[in-house]
Amino acid sequence: LIRHLLKKAGSREEKAYLLNHFLESFRGTLFRQTMFAEFEDMAHKKAARGESLTAESLCSIYRQLNADYFGPAMTVDRQIDYEWERIPHFYTPFYVYQYATGFSAAVAISSRIMSGEPGALEGYKKFLSGGCSMKPIDLLKLCGVDMSTTRPVDEALGFFGELIEEFKKCIHTNE
């Protein structure tokens, strides 16, 4: 849908808005949910080692992850330390990674279909009609997406990079 909307955008401003919206979806789903999964994994490993899970130790883990994920260009202030406390995803353990993998799979599927890859659309229809007949990872293989490799995530990150470059051109030129 986003690719269609970008093609139909009537102005540079509209295109910039759409690109920003999609980039934020990418950031929130692929990067942020991966960071949440890493936080959750680190907290559970800490508990498994018999270490106490205090607010202070969890804040420290979360702060460091924010610094690692967002890098030196972003100021990581003290308020972010407590964000983990209000994230309801942590009530149900070990599922947030599915947002990032699902988003990556969707990007891979749509890229194959949009590029006209032979069999991509038919594979997607088989995937959809497969329902719950197979494990999701096997259903995805029907449309050419192998989540047992890094390829879908690598492709999604490559596409993210392309979108950033397109966004930069859009806001810095008079296209």
Name these PLM-found stretches.
Residues 26-31, 93:
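Hydrophobic transmembrane alpha-helical segments of multi-pass transport and channel proteins
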Residues 18-25:
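Short beta-alpha connecting loops at secondary-structure transitions
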Residues 1-13, 37, 43-175:
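C-terminal, non-catalytic "cap/extension" segments appended to globular domains
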